[in-house]
């Protein structure tokens, strides 16, 4: 019985970090708000890429939910310090609303130095402008 309890405790300690990551401790999230409507921008494709010596490598992709968010954009692999970018594919979003836009894609480059922190990239969007910052 003692061995069973010990094995259960050890298994839960090993599985806890993976379960925590899957449960919402992903290090990267994004949020898009449409400044023209004051509402979230659902259905926007967002691509995560890592800078390598010879260019950019795609790590993950997702679409914003009804609240304009992707809560877990980091792939299921350990984070590493380095340069990354998220590319917001906004052209399709405006096309679906039958609106023109000057920015069909918005690449936002950022640097990860501490892999134990959370990085949030909000995008405030309109047809002819945008702003972004490191959120929380």
From Swiss-Prot:
Give the EC number(s) under which this enzyme is classified: 3.5.2.17
Tell me the GO molecular function terms: hydroxyisourate hydrolase activity
Q: Name one GO biological process term.
A: purine nucleobase metabolic process
- The gene is hiuH
**What single Pfam family name could you report for this chain, choosing any that match?**
Transthyretin
Subunit details? Homotetramer.
Q: Where is the signal peptide?
A: 1-20
Source organism, top-level taxon = Bacteria
Q: Which reaction does it catalyse?
A: 5-hydroxyisourate + H2O = 5-hydroxy-2-oxo-4-ureido-2,5-dihydro-1H-imidazole-5-carboxylate + H(+)
State the protein's name: 5-hydroxyisourate hydrolase
Record carries keyword Hydrolase: yes
Chain's role: Catalyzes the hydrolysis of 5-hydroxyisourate (HIU) to 2-oxo-4-hydroxy-4-carboxy-5-ureidoimidazoline (OHCU).
The miscellaneous comment for this protein is:
HIU hydrolysis also occurs spontaneously, but more slowly.
Q: What class of enzyme is it?
A: hydrolase
Keywords recorded for this protein, A-Z: Hydrolase, Periplasm, Purine metabolism, Signal
InterPro entries in UniProt: Hydroxyisourate_hydrolase (IPR014306), Thyroxine_BS (IPR023418), Transthyretin/HIU_hydrolase (IPR000895), Transthyretin/HIU_hydrolase_d (IPR023416), Transthyretin/HIU_hydrolase_sf (IPR036817), Transthyretin_CS (IPR023419)
Query: Key word Hydrolase present in the record?
Result: yes
The primary site where this protein sits is periplasm
Family, per entry: Belongs to the transthyretin family. 5-hydroxyisourate hydrolase subfamily.
